[in-house]
Every structure is written in C-alpha cells, then in structure tokens.
Amino acid sequence: METVRIATRKSPLALWQSEHVADRLRQAHPGLHVELVPMSTRGDEVLDRSLAAIGGKGLFLKELELAMLRGEADCAVHSLKDVPMELDEPFALPAMLTRHDPADGFVSNLYASLDALPIGARVGTSSLRRQAQLRALRPDLQLLDLRGNVNTRLAKLDNGGYDAIVLAVAGLERLGLGERIVARLQPPQWLPAPAQGAVAVECDGSNARLMALFAGLDDAATRACVEAERAMNRALHGSCHVPVAAIAQWQGQDLHLQGLVGSASDGRAVRAEAVGPASDPEVLGQRVAKMLLDAGAGELLNV
C-alpha cells in the first residue's frame, strides 16, 4: 500500500488542516495510506516577539521543508497566507483547496463591534496588517501584541488581558469556535491578508507522482483569487514586515482585486482596486500593485 506522509505544525488548527487534506486524499485515492508527521517550528516556539522581529512567516515552513528534503515527509500542509511569495527549489504548490471565509473576525466578550469599543480600549493583535487597519479606523485604541495559537489567544482575552482581539474567521470556524465571532471585518472597509482562508499543499515539484496525486484536490476558483492576491504582494515585495492586505472576488468571469498598503504606526493607508480576466490573475495582481505604488505606497513600504 502506498503511503503519503504529511508534515504539519502541531497547533490544533494546523492539525485540523492537515487531517482535512488527508481525508480528501483518502477519498480521492481509496487504498492510499496517509499519515501525519507533526513537527514544532520556530514560529510556534518563539512567542515573546512578533513574527516580523524573528524572521517572518517563513519560520512556519522551514522545518517542514527540511523534513521533506531529509525524506521524513512527502509533503506539507500550510495556511497559504503563511507561505512566502517565492518558494525555494524544488518546492511547488500542487493543490490549493477550496477557500474558507477569508474575513477577519472581531472577538470580544464585552463589545458587539469595533465601533462599540470605548476610547482607549485594548485590542490584541501582532499582525502589522491588522494594526494598520485598526489605526486607520480607530486611532484611539491601545494595540497590544498577541501571539500563540487560536486557543491561547482566546484564553488571554478571556483572562481579561484585552477588551477585544482580531482573528481569522477561517481558523475559528475550522476549530468549531465560530460562536466566538461577534462581528466580521469585511471589504471594502477591511481587507484580509493575501490568501487568508486558503490551505495549500507543498511538495517536491519534480516528483511527478506526488504532483499528480494532489492535483485533484486543487480548486481552480480559489487558485485564481489567491494567485492574484499573491502576485500583488510579490510585486510590492510584501512580507509580514509590511502591512499589505488583498482580496480577490469573482465578478462574473472576471476577478475584482482590492489591495491596501498601510502603516502600523500612524494609520496611513493607500488603496487600489481593479477588475481583470480570471484567466490571468498574475497580470491583475501586478496591475493593482502598480496602482498602489503610483498612489504613494512606496513611501509606506520603505518605512
């Protein structure tokens, strides 16, 4: 019996996502044996500093990629928003699964919405993208760092450390915690991270058998959207060091891409949007990136 070993982070959300991919693989290939290889990454272990300060979201991938290179795993499953814009050789993304809700969720035990927060309320997030949009919408708020997995962050809220926190809707709902969401933060006022809500499979792109095995899990509609978002981010040379947000949505046969570059320090933001054929998401992403740069985003990117 053929076996596929999936490298995964140990967090509850990462394990859920990897088991979801494993289930899809078993359904598509009856008789295939799929097992998880849980691993800890530096991004999971260092929680006293922001991701930007310790090297970025790529920290969540490196140990999993090394496991594949060592022959300890055949593939890895990631939240696509954590995957760098450029993959190292020989890696590829053969499958981007159907996207979950890409929105951010406003979570609070006391207040029903962002607007309902009192002046000076404490909001937890370590995401520069979320901080930038919070600064733009509510410059009076106290923004406090918040690291850890979903359950850890909720526990910190429940223990009174924050008046509200912002988390991805997809992560909460995948863990059965959707009832904690009191409001969705949605376009056009609020934009998510590029590829937020999407799960991707990474493997050796030169391994034709693995590439074919995962191809059936790929969702073309999701891939078109996230490729536009990632193309925009790539053209801006965006990373977790810079507040960049993007969301592509279907509009008939076309994609409508909205993008934002912000400042986490003072709430300044530059926005742009465009519609283009879904058959060429890369061009659409590059177009919106150019519009952002032409509107002054370069000044924020170089801060």
UniProtKB/Swiss-Prot annotation:
Q: Which InterPro entries match?
A: HemC, Porphobilin_deaminase_cofac_BS, Porphobilin_deaminase_N, Porphobilinogen_deaminase_C, Porphobilinogen_deaminase_C_sf
Which EC numbers characterise this protein's activity in its record? Answer: 2.5.1.61
Q: What reaction is this protein's catalytic activity?
A: 4 porphobilinogen + H2O = hydroxymethylbilane + 4 NH4(+)
Q: What PROSITE patterns does the record tag this protein with?
A: PORPHOBILINOGEN_DEAM
Q: Which co-factor is required?
A: dipyrromethane
A Gene Ontology BP annotation from the UniProt entry: protoporphyrinogen IX biosynthetic process
Q: Which UniProt keywords apply?
A: Porphyrin biosynthesis, Transferase
Identify one Gene Ontology CC term for this UniProt entry. cytoplasm
Q: Where are the S-(dipyrrolylmethanemethyl)cysteine modifications? A: 240
Pathway annotation: Porphyrin-containing compound metabolism; protoporphyrin-IX biosynthesis; coproporphyrinogen-III from 5-aminolevulinate: step 2/4
Q: Its function?
A: Tetrapolymerization of the monopyrrole PBG into the hydroxymethylbilane pre-uroporphyrinogen in several discrete steps.
Q: Which HAMAP family match?
A: Porphobil_deam
Family recorded in the similarity comment:
Belongs to the HMBS family.
Q: Which PANTHER family match?
A: PORPHOBILINOGEN DEAMINASE (PTHR11557:SF0)
Q: What is this protein called?
A: Porphobilinogen deaminase
Which lineage is the organism of this entry classified under, starting from the top rank?
Answer: Bacteria, Pseudomonadati, Pseudomonadota, Gammaproteobacteria, Lysobacterales
